[in-house]
A protein has these predicted regions:
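Residues embedded in well-ordered regular secondary structure
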Residues: 1-5, 15-17, 21, 74-213, ...
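Extracytoplasmic beta-strand/coil segments of soluble accessory domains associated
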Residues: 1-26, 44, 54-74
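Short, glycine-/polar-rich solvent-exposed loops and beta-turns at beta-strand/coil boundaries
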Residues: 1-3, 35-40, 57-62, 179, ...
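Extracellular/periplasmic, surface-exposed regions of secreted and cell-surface proteins
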Residues: 12, 19-20, 219, 225-234, ...
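Short beta-strands and strand-coil junctions in structured, solvent-facing domains, enriched
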Residues: 14-16, 30-32, 51-56, 73-76, ...
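Short, T/G/N/S-enriched strand-turn elements that build extracellular solenoid repeat scaffolds
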Residues: 34-35, 650
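Phosphoinositide-dependent membrane-docking surfaces
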Residues: 39-49
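Low-complexity intrinsically disordered tracts that form flexible linkers/tails across taxa
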Residues: 247-273, 650-654
Length: 659
């Protein structure tokens, strides 16, 4: 629980660079993930998809924009709200159908041994059956889950389980690690204000217990928002939020013996989670607790997953991750010369992260090194500021909206990680408890982005709309010769429902045709200085050496996308509303890690802009107001998207190499 959602807007935006949309909270970029925002603080959320809507956000809006507006205070009586929510988490996709009965497994394995004795060993049917009964348990590593002798477990005449056999243990690898988890959330908010000042404050606590044992997510959030109208021409405000998330996240993914899902699907039901003696009594460890079975004990040698027990690792390994997030925003709006407004926005996000990844010395992945622990700390600070100058003018039926802006982003990341092995106390993950330092590393990276942008919007009689925008961005991730990128967009829409021939049709609330085209860039390449050669300092026979880790490429530049969008918005009878849109997104200069010839040495890859990709498709959404009264409101909405992704230039490149 607590994992950040993967958000894709209209398909895959990139191959090697970031595919995540930009998150905007109250008008400024937010560097965190959505799971750190209290849902109860959100007033509205909108997803911007086409180039005309995203153009003002430049390179960071290449994969779409998620616009979030938080709640604010209102003029009037102070209101206090408290709500509590409870729920349950359970496994949604049940385990695949496999043999989960020990007796059935013994019978099937016995049949396989008998057939092998006849087909490979050349034995008669009777000889093969007796041999299979005698070697069944030894072949399975000495594991006998029943209270009869090994050779008597399967009747060699019938091939069935001995009717006198009684099960000594019955553990299910596909069920025992899971449970029903309680989810509880509490929200407290207060809002109010006067004619000039409004305020909103909230506190939130979320405790989300997973359906997997020893796995949970906790979140604490607080928010304070204040807006103040100083006088007729000046308005100011600030918005401060704090969030802490604590995640206990065991290893469950992948296709290895540490994964509960993989291990549980593949291990036979005759192998227990805990150790048992021949009477079926649990064997206790030194602490008096039931001892886990790792498949290698006296008289037992499990042929599958020896030294592995992912359930034991689930309960004994420690994987705890904590984020502390402080976000602050301040703004000032100045109105002057009647039609002009200047807005200054300043936001700062400060992220602190600590992580513990401890693998127990009792058994599992770190058994051979007597335990292993990684400790990680990371600090990320991002500063965003923009200055906006707007001019709004209405002349008769003509309305103009002109925007000029400047934006700067600066961030700094510091990272420190150390790893030790050979731990004295088996449940203490602190590095001071480990004897052997195996790895320690740290780095600091910085990133700068600057942009100048403009937008012109025009409409005539609230019927015909035109918009155009231009933005010029510079990114520190590129060589100075390729640092600047130019991006633009144009759009138009026609509100047909305002035409004289439709204006009096009561069934039609709105009907609008729209189209846009524009270009955008993406600089989120995963490396803050990819145009520079990068090295790591290493020990070399008692001296200082370096390794060549990254082959720089000063010709790297922006990933560029051309976006076309056309659609229709509709609303009928004050009940049904929605839209249908067709889109094409063609991206060129995609980042690609190109293999180098052996003669070039190491590193044997280099990052280049050498791919192209196309996303095209159609999406539709509809909302129906089933009940819309003062006391009851019931809306139902649905959406569907169908798109095709095509990597165009890569196929030509592979064909040219004959692959």
């Amino acid at each position: 629980p607590g994992s950040a959602a993967t958000i894709s807007v209209r398909g895959i935006g990139s191959i090697s660079a970031s595919r995540s949309p930009l998150i905007i909270v109250d008008g400024v970029p937010y560097e965190g993930s959505l799971n750190s925002i209290n849902n109860a603080d959100i007033e509205s959320m909108t997803v911007l998809k086409d180039a005309a809507a995203n153009s003002l956000y430049g390179a960071r809006g290449a994969n779409g924009v998620v616009m979030i507006t938080t709640k604010k205070g209102t003029n009037g009586k102070t209101a206090v709200s408290l709500d509590a929510k409870w729920g349950a988490n359970s496994r949604g996709v049940k385990a695949y159908k496999t043999i989960r009965n020990a007796g059935e497994y013994y019978e099937m394995f016995w049949e396989a041994l008998k057939n092998a004795n006849m087909n490979i060993g050349g034995m008669s049917s009777a000889e093969a059956a007796i041999n299979a009964s005698q070697n069944l348990v030894p072949t399975l590593g000495g594991y006998n889950a029943y209270n009869v002798d090994n050779a008597l477990l399967i009747d060699p005449v019938s091939g069935y389980l001995n009717p006198n056999a009684q099960l000594l243990y019955n553990e299910d690898w596909q069920e025992d690690p899971f449970k029903n988890g309680l989810r509880q959330e509490y929200n407290l908010s207060i809002k109010g204000g006067t004619e000039k000042t409004s305020f909103y404050a909230s506190l939130n606590f979320l405790d989300d217990n997973s359906y997997l044992r020893n796995s949970n997510f906790k979140r604490y959030t607080g928010r304070l928002k204040l807006d103040h109208q100083v006088n007729d021409w000046l308005k100011t405000g600030f918005n401060m939020a704090y969030a802490q998330t604590n995640t206990n996240s065991p290893n469950v993914g992948g296709s290895n013996y540490s994964s509960l899902f993989y291990f549980g699907q593949n291990i036979a039901p005759i192998y227990p989670i805990y150790r048992y003696d021949r009477t079926g009594q649990p064997i206790l460890d030194a602490t008096g607790a039931p001892a886990y079975d790792y498949g290698v004990t006296e008289g037992h040698e499990r042929p599958y997953g020896a030294n592995a027990n992912p359930y034991a690792q689930l309960m004994n390994d420690i994987r705890e991750y904590t984020y502390d997030i402080v976000s602050a925003k301040a703004y000032a709006e100045v109105k002057f010369l009647k039609d002009f407004k200047f807005t200054l926005n300043l936001s700062a996000d400060n992220f602190g992260y600590t992580g513990v990844d401890f693998q127990t010395p009792i058994g599992g992945d770190a058994l051979n090194v007597n335990g292993r622990s990684y400790r990680t700390t990371q600090r990320y600070f991002a500063l965003n500021t923009n200055q906006l100058l707007t001019y709004e003018k209405t002349i008769g039926d003509h309305r103009f909206d002109v925007l000029l802006g400047h934006e700067v982003k600066a961030d700094k990341k510091t990272y420190l990680q150390a790893m030790k092995e050979q731990f004295l106390i088996p449940d203490n993950p602190e590095l001071s408890n480990g004897a052997a330092l195996k790895d320690a590393t740290s780095y600091t990276s910085e990133y700068r982005l600057e942009g100048f942008f403009s937008r012109i919007q025009y409409d005539y009689k609230d019927r015909y709309y035109l918009t155009g925008s231009y933005r010029r961005d510079a990114s520190s991730r590129f060589h100075p010769d390729n640092r600047w990128g130019n991006f633009w967009s144009v759009g138009a829409s026609w509100r047909i429902s305002e035409e004289s021939f439709l204006r009096d049709v009561k069934a039609i609330n709105t009907l609008k045709l729209k189209a846009s085209y524009g270009t955008q860039g993406n600089d989120a390449l995963g490396n803050d200085t990819p145009y520079l050669d990068q090295y790591t300092v290493v020990p070399q026979d008692g001296a200082i050496g370096i390794t060549y880790d990254w082959r720089g490429n000063k010709d790297l530049t922006w990933e560029k996308s051309n976006n076309f969008n056309a659609g229709i918005e509709f609303g009928f009878w004050d009940i049904v509303s929605g839209n249908v849109e067709y889109f094409i997104k063609e991206t060129k200069d995609l980042l690609y890690y190109k293999s180098m010839p052996p003669s070039a040495g190491l590193p044997n890859i280099i990052a280049v802009n050498d791919m192209s990709m196309k996303n095209s498709g159609i999406e539709a959404e509809v909302e129906v107001k089933i009940i819309n009264t003062n006391n009851i409101k019931w809306n139902v909405s649905a959406n569907i998207t169908k798109y095709k992704n095509e990597v165009t230039k890569l196929r030509e490149h592979i064909r040219a190499m004959g692959e």
